[in-house]
Amino acid sequence: MLNIFSLICLNSALYSSSFFFGKLPEAYAFLSPIVDFMPVIPLFFFLLAFVWQAAVSFR
């Protein structure tokens, strides 16, 4: 599971600087690190579901 997560993080970091994605306008350039991290955020909710179920003993 950790390998999949690290692979996704690595891929999002590599492809975020790719020519396939557009650059942010200069006015929003300070938000660039947040925008690079945003594709990974849904995975945290997915992992949170497993942590929550483990906390309640998978009822």
UniProtKB/Swiss-Prot annotation:
Membrane topology: Single-pass membrane protein
Major localization listed first in the record, in broad terms: plastid
Coiled coil stretches, renumbered: none
Propeptide: 1-22
SUPFAM superfamilies documented for this protein: Photosystem II reaction center protein K, PsbK
Keyword Thylakoid: yes
Alphabetized UniProt keyword annotations: Chloroplast, Membrane, Photosynthesis, Photosystem II, Plastid, Reaction center, Thylakoid, Transmembrane, Transmembrane helix
A Pfam family of this chain: PsbK
One record GO biological process: photosynthesis
InterPro entries per record: PSII_PsbK, PSII_PsbK_sf
Annotated function: One of the components of the core complex of photosystem II (PSII). PSII is a light-driven water:plastoquinone oxidoreductase that uses light energy to abstract electrons from H(2)O, generating O(2) and a proton gradient subsequently used for ATP formation. It consists of a core antenna complex that captures photons, and an electron transfer chain that converts photonic excitation into a charge separation. May be involved in PSII dimerization.
The family this protein is said to belong to: Belongs to the PsbK family.
HAMAP family (UniProt xref): PSII_PsbK
Entry-linked NCBIfam families: PRK02553.1
Subunit structure: PSII is composed of 1 copy each of membrane proteins PsbA, PsbB, PsbC, PsbD, PsbE, PsbF, PsbH, PsbI, PsbJ, PsbK, PsbL, PsbM, PsbT, PsbX, PsbY, PsbZ, Psb30/Ycf12, at least 3 peripheral proteins of the oxygen-evolving complex and a large number of cofactors. It forms dimeric complexes. This protein, PsbL and plastoquinone-9 are found in PSII dimers but not seen in PSII monomers.
Protein name listed in UniProt: Photosystem II reaction center protein K
Record organism: Spinacia oleracea (Spinach)
